[in-house]
Amino acid sequence: NEKGSILFTGNTGCGKTFLSNCIARELIRRYYSVVYLTATDMFDILAGSRFNGNDDDEAKDRAAYILDCDLLIIDDLGTELNNTFVSSQLFYCINERLLRKKSTIISTNLSMTMLRDTYSDRISSRIISQYSIIPLYGDDIRTKIV
């Protein structure tokens, strides 16, 4: 597949995170750098690097690694509190990683329409054109295990 990034969509418990982690495990086994973050954690890191002042080198390093790692996994996009900062940082992250030719996996419960409405046309346009969109279907497997 020429598209190096993936968007997994689907209901809760249909295997989006599991598949993301399977891909991560294989890439780590092949010595690629992989960062897994929930969307909330990623935006917290980006906010820390932006607003903690110039003295927080660790926060800046963590934010830089989000952009530079071979594979970034953003889990549960759409569960974070959305605001202008979040939307701008999501655009920056997606766009910058595309420019650097770095792969990203995003998992979300949001449909493409909801994704566009929640964030922006600029973000959804890049995802639609540059990501393999893989919808997952099925019941919540967590409730079947219990």
Task: Give the predicted meaning of each segment.
Residues 3, 28, 32-68:
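Short glycine-rich substrate-engagement loop in P-loop NTPases that contacts/grips substrate
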Residues 3-20:
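Walker A/P-loop nucleotide-binding motif
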Residues 7, 11, 39-42, 77:
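Histidine- and/or cysteine-centered catalytic micro-motif in compact active-site loops
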Residues 18-30:
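P-loop NTPase Walker A phosphate-binding motif
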Residues 32-33, 68-71, 100-106:
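Loop/turn-to-beta-strand initiation segments
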Residues 61-70, 130-138:
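Short, basic, helix/turn surface patches
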